[in-house]
Amino acid sequence: MSGLPAETSIERYVTVGAYSLLRSCTIEPECIIGQHSILMEGSLVETHSILEAGSVVPPGRRIPTGELWAGNPARFVRTLTHEETLEIPKLAVAINDLSKTHFFEFLPYSTVYLEVEKLKKKLGISV
């Protein structure tokens, strides 16, 4: 028992890369978590921060506001520019819009399922 909350909190305009693992951590608004990253228990990523792909944030580590971190374990790389912090929410919105465009490509039965349903309806077949 660590005394840390067992929940993971992700706030608005956050981009989490594919295959990332988030364990009882907090990600404040407008952050980017690179793909294949791991955030351990009690870690905190503050507003306007970026964690590079493949990074590992140890338990209890805090990534301060406006910083870029990378590596295993994650270490400070540099401070983000004002322009970079302005682009973070724009990226989140763009990815969300793109996901809506491709939503039907990831059905559990593939898109063939939709074609079969249309054909069954056209032929009057009920199952």
Locations of the language-model features?
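Glycine/small-residue-rich loop that forms an oxyanion/phosphate-binding "nest" at active or ligand-binding sites
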Residues: 5-13
